[in-house]
Amino acid sequence: MAFMRKAAVYLGLVEDDEERYEDYDDYDDAEPHRREPREAVERDLGSRRTAVVRRMDARESSPADPAELRRVSEPAPTERPTPPLRVTTLHPRTYNEARAIGEHFREGIPVIMNLTEMDDADAKRLVDFAAGLTFGLRGSIERITSKVFLLSPRNVEVTAEDKRRMAEGGFFNQS
């Protein structure tokens, strides 16, 4: 409707509402004086209420006797027994088995991918999938041997000793 009204005003069919208002020359554009909040509070509370304020010295803020001091100790960290680290070793034969790798990794389980039984083209695709998976879930991927990779979730740290055992074949005999 505003468009129609503006068109009618332009064509001179109706009177413009803005022309009805007169300009006032004595209008002051300056901002009105604001009183300070403290002044307003003092004026409002002036006769009704008075408060007594006393400044506290540094001597008064600390206890006079060291025996009055109470020692607060931090609670000792409780060590939760960590469950034994479960590592899944998978020997995929086709790229279609990538889903199983992703599901185990998403659950927070380190995955060893043994790609020795795959052809090179599918192995490359699976390594690309694993790299994207570890990047997306903030994990890490490491090459153990030429066609064997370790995928570690972000909250799992595999020690150098474990990696050495994997390279020697200690984990590959589990499946």
UniProtKB/Swiss-Prot annotation:
Residues 30-47, 54-73 have a biased composition (Basic and acidic residues). Keywords: Cell cycle, Cell division, Cytoplasm, Septation. One of its GO terms (cellular component) is cytoplasm. InterPro entries: Cell_div_SepF, Cell_div_SepF/SepF-rel, SepF-like_sf. Gene3D superfamilies: SepF-like protein. Signal peptide: none annotated. Its main location: cytoplasm. Homodimer. Interacts with FtsZ. Belongs to the SepF family. PANTHER family: CELL DIVISION PROTEIN SEPF. This is Cell division protein SepF. The lineage of its organism: Bacteria, Bacillati, Actinomycetota, Actinomycetes, Acidothermales. The gene is sepF.
